Every structure is written in structure tokens, then in C-alpha cells.
Amino acid sequence: MDSGRDFLTLHGLQDDKDLQALLKGGQLLKVKSNSWRRERFYKLQEDCKTIWQESRKVMRTPESQLFSIEDIQEVRMGHRTEGLEKFARDVPENRCFSIVFKDQRNTLDLIAPSPADAQHWVQGLGKIIHHSGSMDQQQKLRHWIHSCLRKADKNKDNKMSFKELQNFLKELNIQVDDSYARKIFKECDHSQTDSLEDEEIETFYKILTQRKEIDRTFEEATGSKETLSVDQLVTFLQHQQREEEAGPALALSLIERYEPSETAKAQRQMTKDGFLMYLLSADGSAFDLAHRRVYQDMDQPLSHYLVSSSHNTYLLEDQLTGPSSTEAYIRALCKGCRCLELDCWDGPNQEPIIYHGYTFTSKILFCDVVRAIRDYAFKASPYPVILSLENHCSLEQQRVMARHLRTLLGPMLLDRPLDGVVTSLPSPEQLRGKILLKGKKLGGLFPPGGEGGPEATVVSDEDEAAEMEDEAVRSQVQHKSKEDKLRLAKELSDMVIYCKSVHFRGFPSSGTSGQAFYEMSSFSENRALRLLQESGNSFVRHNVNHLSRIYPAGWRTDSSNYSPVEMWNGGCQIVALNFQTPGSEMDVYQGRFLDNGACGYVLKPAFLRDPNSTFNSRALAHGPWWTPKRLNVRVISGQQLPKVNKNKNSIVDPKVTVEIHGVSRDVASRQTAVVTNNGFNPWWDTELEFEVAVPELALVRFVVEDYDASSKNDFIGQSTIPLKSLKQGYRHIHLLSKNGDQHPSATLFVKVALQD
């Protein structure tokens, strides 16, 4: 069972020159610094899933010399990472390439012996990444099982002894009783050679991957027949799956897409294999397929949307000593983030730098960050990117900043009001492909004094401090002598159009005018929570026409996060989180912005866009938002849950928790029992029930943990889905890793019902 050959044949790549070169392997120069370049051997393994890298480190385990292609975010040709930009300028770009990983491990910067070798690696890896992504769940499952078989086949004779079979089951994360394993082994060993080969391994594979819960559901739908007719499939789609579009057209399109048997397809029928393929596909996912594209109205003012926003975007770790990196900006943009933070200070050689002021975090050039933003701003979404500037620079270096922004961003930069948009904020659609600046500004929407205006003006203490998040920095600003006050360069000020940073002076009372529509304030999480507690409805109304930015409290020097949900419930749009810090807060954040095609903008519910709204999440009364639902989740089973610690021999003991995040009365959590020693196909079949009063603000988080009686449970995987995007019926939930990346085959099988 050669999974690599299977993979190549499946995608017609068996004669591909690039992949042949990678399977053969070759020497590459690994680059770490100006003085550290070492030759190392790299080779694509036969499973076409992993790369082996030579290591000279003492005590290195064989597993640690492998990395999975599934962990690769991107392969870049040329000097396109900080490492190669700094340390390989002497080598032609066409020999240099970098492997950038999804998680927070270091980028692998490499130099090939020739341009042709570099091309083989870049194109070859690109093909595997592309084709792996296009495999359906059944193909992924088969490919994964084959690679586990290869690992277990210690003597490489393509046969499976009973001892190797036990190793194989451990690889699969399943503890099977020896007598049961021996029983299956004997059933499959037709040749009675005390080893399994070829068809015998296939038979074993089929017994292992049989899913009784799917068999049961299929039998119910067919009335115990071998296949589903179009009418039976329509009935299943209507009554179980609650599909609004259920009808013969949808049923036939599912048969066409997922039925592997040409005979069944010709007879307009679906077999059990086709049924499983459908349930494992995007059509059978718990997340509404229609919400994977932009489907909301994108023509409303910016203040009517939640905006995916990052705090201290330049950091990869904590705020005191962590590294700053342009890579952090690229990661945030690739995750759909639309508001980035740039903490700007004077740097050497008249070049502004970005870092966390008065700390030991490393420094990066402002121009390098702007270049990275230019290159990646619109890869994940076409909608506007807001650059939140925290400006500590001298006049001279502010002018350098303005010059870099203008020359590097060119027409992407919004540097004047849009025609006719002078009384309210423009919409995401009007700002498509544009980069906006948020920062201090002299005067109103139009530059003061035209051409002959002042060259620079002193900014008020309050407006300058309004932009400074760090309390130490803010108090320094407020105690500066007159000569040291921040003077703002007109060139930079004129680039701030619709996002002028101002000090928040309170909600206007009747008859007093508040902020201009293009003025916005920033609030620490504590101040925002206080405003929500004391004036929740006023905050909601303020946020109908004005943008509000929320940032983490100053004490969070470890870059921990706060819950964004309460801020969203108050209508706050730019709720900035530390994207570099995984955890439940980022899980919920990613879940919220998975909606609307993951474009980084999600339309707020109507009651958070109404200037006369009476909504207050802290004092919930009846209103248009009050549409109570009963949510019933039956957690049936799990599939291919990953090992928590790959170096441990232990098998996971999984349990599932389902959480509701929303207004405080809706917040709830229920859990299943623990299944011991089975991460491969655990079975719970447990019903969990919830009452949800404000479904438009609710998110459902499914968390799988490895139970540990003596310490904190280990995280295995999770998925967070807005309740409005959660599909009913029998569904698979595709689990994400701690860093928010998709586990290739890990799923939960559930049945969801939602009733008024």
C-alpha cells in the first residue's frame, strides 16, 4: 500500500519532473544569519506528506527531522522573508526560496545550488499543497491511513505482522483490546501466513473505517435498501437536514458531485459510499456553505460592520521581549484581518521603526512593514485595510513615513475623501482595494488652509494621548513640556481621511453635537466594559454612526486576550485582539469572521444599526432582537482526532464541550462523558440542549479535549460557528488546531436541531 504512489496517480503526477526531483532529494543551504549557512539534505518522503531534513543536532529524534506539508502556509521564491532579505543579498533571487509555516515556528530560509533546483522545490511543493487541498475527506482519510501503515511497517516488506498491526493502531490514536485486534487480524488473514498483505490489508482497512452511525442513518433514509432514490434523498434533505433548497435539483446535484459509482449515478441513486462522501463534504458541513462567500450587503457605512482587527500586529510573541516581524503582518492579513496596528518611533539613519516602545521587543523598519502590507493586503479579501498608526516620530521622520506610504502604496492609499462621501462614512464596497490611515489629523475632513496651510501643528494633549495605548507612554505624553509636544507633519495628517483619532469626551446629551462622523475613539477593554455597564444603550447608538476601537488592558504584557463578544454586543466594530496568542478568545474571533466569506467585514444585526435602538446587552429587555430558540446538539462521534503529544505513546481520552457565547443570559456550556483510549473513532451519542434568547449575537463553540484526571485537560481541536451559520441535521464539524489551522481529517459527527 504505497500512499505516495496513490497520491501521485490520483492527481496524474507520477511523471512530474519537479516531484521526481523532490522524491530523490538534494542538498540545500539553510540560512540563519550572516555567519550561519549550513548545507543540509532535504527529501520528500514517499508518502508525499512529509519532508525529511538532515540535522546535526545531538539527541535529535527521527520524528523531529520530519515536517508535514500540511503545516506549510506558503512557499516563497526570492528574497521575500526577513531572513533572506537580510542574510542572502549576495545570492541571486532565483536560487533563494523560503518555506513559511502555519504555526509560529521559524521560517525555513534556503538557497538551492541552481535556479532549476529552486524551481523544482517551489513548484513541486506548490503542486502537493494544491492537490492535498483539493482532496475530499475520503481521499484524505485513505492517504493518512496509508502513511500510518508505512510508519508501522518497520521492516518495509509491505506486509503487516500482528506486532506491526499494534503499532499501526497506536499511530491511528486508538487503543484496541489485544484479543479484539487479534480477532480482526485473523478474520483478514485469509492466506493464514500470520501477516496481512494487499487485499487483506484492504479488508482490514474497511473493517476499521466502517462507521456504524452512518450505516444507521443511511438505513433510516433508505428504508433498509441498498441505495437512496432521488425522492428519498429529497425527503432526507427536507426533514433531517432542513435544507431550504431541498428538491430534486439539489438531490441530483449531490448525486452528481459525491456518488463514486457510475452505475448508481446513471440510475439517479446514491449508495452508502456516496452518502458518506456527501456528509463529509462542504455540503454536509455544520457551517453554512452559502456563508462561505460574501453574501451580506456591503454598501452600508463602515460603522455598520464588525471589522477583523489585530492589536500589536508587529509582535510574534509577548509585549516585553518578543520579536517584531513583518511576517506577523502577513499572517494577520492572510487570516482576513482588516485593521493592523503600526507603533512608529524614530529610527537610525532617518528611517522610522516599528516596535513596542520602552520595551525589549525587536525593531523592524516602517518601510518593510508597508511593503509587506502592500503585497498581502488584498490576498484574502478585497475590502479595505485600515492602518492604525500610533505615532511617536519627530517631524522629519513623519515626513519619511508619509513619503513611504505614498510611494509604496501608490493608488491603494486613500488620500482624499471619495466624491460625494462627505456626510457619512463610506461603505466597504466603495473602499474596495483601498488602504486607509487611522491617526491624528489637523482640522476636519478637508486639509486646513489649502496649499498655504501650516507646515506642522501641535496636537492637543488629549488627542495625542487618545492614541497611546500603553499607560506609561500615555502619562509621558500628558506630562511633556510645551517644546516636546507632538507636532504633526501636514504630509502625514492629510493622509488621514475617515479615521481621525480623537479623545472621547462622552456621549452627547440632547441638543449637543458629538463627534464628527469621520472622528473615532479608542478605548481600553476596561473603559469599554465600564461604558457598556453604565451607558450600554448610548454606546450602541454612538456606534451606529461612529467607529470605536477597543484594545487589550495595559496589564496584558503576555499578549493574552479579552473576550471580544461583549464589545460586539455593544456594537463596537474594531475590537483588536492579539492574533499571535491562541486561545478561546481567538477561536471565537475567527469563528465570527468565518462568516460572510471570511472577508473581514461582518454586517451588524439591524438592532445594532438603528440610531433609535433601545438594545442594551447588560439590561436585556424584549425587542426585535428577542427571538428565543431551543438548540439541541446530539454529539454522536469523532473521527481521526490528532494525538496531543506525538512523542508520547499515550492514546487520547476525548470529551466534547459545547459552549454558547453571546449576551450574558445566553452564555452556557455542556459536555459529554469521557471516552477512554480512542482518538480514532470515539462514540458519545449524547444530547445537549440550550436556550438562546438573542440568536443573532450567539456563537457555538465545539471543543474537544484530552481528559486528564490529575491536571488541566489538553486541547485537541475546536470549531466555532455563528449560530446563524450553523446548519441543522446530520453534520460533520471540521476541527481546527490551537493556531486556527484546519486538521486534515479530524471531525465531529453531530445532529443539530433548532426550534422556536
From Swiss-Prot:
<dbReference type="Pfam" id="PF16457">
    <property type="entry name" value="PH_12"/>
</dbReference>
<feature type="binding site">
    <location>
        <position position="677"/>
    </location>
    <ligand>
        <name>Ca(2+) 4</name>
    </ligand>
</feature>
<dbReference type="InterPro" id="IPR002048">
    <property type="entry name" value="EF_hand_dom"/>
</dbReference>
<dbReference type="Pfam" id="PF00387">
    <property type="entry name" value="PI-PLC-Y"/>
</dbReference>
<keyword id="KW-0325">Glycoprotein</keyword>
<keyword id="KW-0597">Phosphoprotein</keyword>
<feature type="binding site">
    <location>
        <position position="155"/>
    </location>
    <ligand>
        <name>Ca(2+) 1</name>
    </ligand>
</feature>
<dbReference type="InterPro" id="IPR000008">
    <property type="entry name" value="C2_dom"/>
</dbReference>
<feature type="binding site">
    <location>
        <position position="706"/>
    </location>
    <ligand>
        <name>Ca(2+) 5</name>
    </ligand>
</feature>
<feature type="binding site">
    <location>
        <position position="157"/>
    </location>
    <ligand>
        <name>Ca(2+) 1</name>
    </ligand>
</feature>
<feature type="binding site">
    <location>
        <position position="708"/>
    </location>
    <ligand>
        <name>Ca(2+) 5</name>
    </ligand>
</feature>
<keyword id="KW-0443">Lipid metabolism</keyword>
<feature type="binding site">
    <location>
        <position position="153"/>
    </location>
    <ligand>
        <name>Ca(2+) 1</name>
    </ligand>
</feature>
<keyword id="KW-0677">Repeat</keyword>
<feature type="active site">
    <location>
        <position position="311"/>
    </location>
</feature>
<feature type="binding site">
    <location>
        <position position="390"/>
    </location>
    <ligand>
        <name>Ca(2+) 3</name>
    </ligand>
</feature>
<feature type="binding site">
    <location>
        <position position="191"/>
    </location>
    <ligand>
        <name>Ca(2+) 2</name>
    </ligand>
</feature>
<comment type="function">
    <text>The production of the second messenger molecules diacylglycerol (DAG) and inositol 1,4,5-trisphosphate (IP3) is mediated by activated phosphatidylinositol-specific phospholipase C enzymes. Essential for trophoblast and placental development. Binds phosphatidylinositol 4,5-bisphosphate.</text>
</comment>
<feature type="binding site">
    <location>
        <position position="440"/>
    </location>
    <ligand>
        <name>substrate</name>
    </ligand>
</feature>
<dbReference type="InterPro" id="IPR035892">
    <property type="entry name" value="C2_domain_sf"/>
</dbReference>
<dbReference type="InterPro" id="IPR018247">
    <property type="entry name" value="EF_Hand_1_Ca_BS"/>
</dbReference>
<feature type="domain" description="C2">
    <location>
        <begin position="609"/>
        <end position="737"/>
    </location>
</feature>
<feature type="modified residue" description="Phosphothreonine">
    <location>
        <position position="457"/>
    </location>
</feature>
<feature type="binding site">
    <location>
        <position position="189"/>
    </location>
    <ligand>
        <name>Ca(2+) 2</name>
    </ligand>
</feature>
<feature type="binding site">
    <location>
        <position position="341"/>
    </location>
    <ligand>
        <name>Ca(2+) 3</name>
    </ligand>
</feature>
<dbReference type="GO" id="GO:0046488">
    <property type="term" value="P:phosphatidylinositol metabolic process"/>
</dbReference>
<dbReference type="GO" id="GO:0005546">
    <property type="term" value="F:phosphatidylinositol-4,5-bisphosphate binding"/>
</dbReference>
<keyword id="KW-0807">Transducer</keyword>
<feature type="binding site">
    <location>
        <position position="343"/>
    </location>
    <ligand>
        <name>Ca(2+) 3</name>
    </ligand>
</feature>
<keyword id="KW-0378">Hydrolase</keyword>
<feature type="domain" description="PH">
    <location>
        <begin position="21"/>
        <end position="130"/>
    </location>
</feature>
<feature type="binding site">
    <location>
        <position position="159"/>
    </location>
    <ligand>
        <name>Ca(2+) 1</name>
    </ligand>
</feature>
<protein>
    <recommendedName>
        <fullName>1-phosphatidylinositol 4,5-bisphosphate phosphodiesterase delta-1</fullName>
        <ecNumber>3.1.4.11</ecNumber>
    </recommendedName>
</protein>
<feature type="binding site">
    <location>
        <position position="195"/>
    </location>
    <ligand>
        <name>Ca(2+) 2</name>
    </ligand>
</feature>
<dbReference type="InterPro" id="IPR028391">
    <property type="entry name" value="PLC-delta1_cat"/>
</dbReference>
<dbReference type="Pfam" id="PF00168">
    <property type="entry name" value="C2"/>
</dbReference>
<feature type="binding site">
    <location>
        <position position="707"/>
    </location>
    <ligand>
        <name>Ca(2+) 5</name>
    </ligand>
</feature>
<feature type="binding site">
    <location>
        <position position="200"/>
    </location>
    <ligand>
        <name>Ca(2+) 2</name>
    </ligand>
</feature>
<dbReference type="GO" id="GO:0005886">
    <property type="term" value="C:plasma membrane"/>
</dbReference>
<feature type="domain" description="EF-hand 2">
    <location>
        <begin position="176"/>
        <end position="211"/>
    </location>
</feature>
<feature type="domain" description="PI-PLC Y-box">
    <location>
        <begin position="492"/>
        <end position="609"/>
    </location>
</feature>
<dbReference type="GO" id="GO:0005737">
    <property type="term" value="C:cytoplasm"/>
</dbReference>
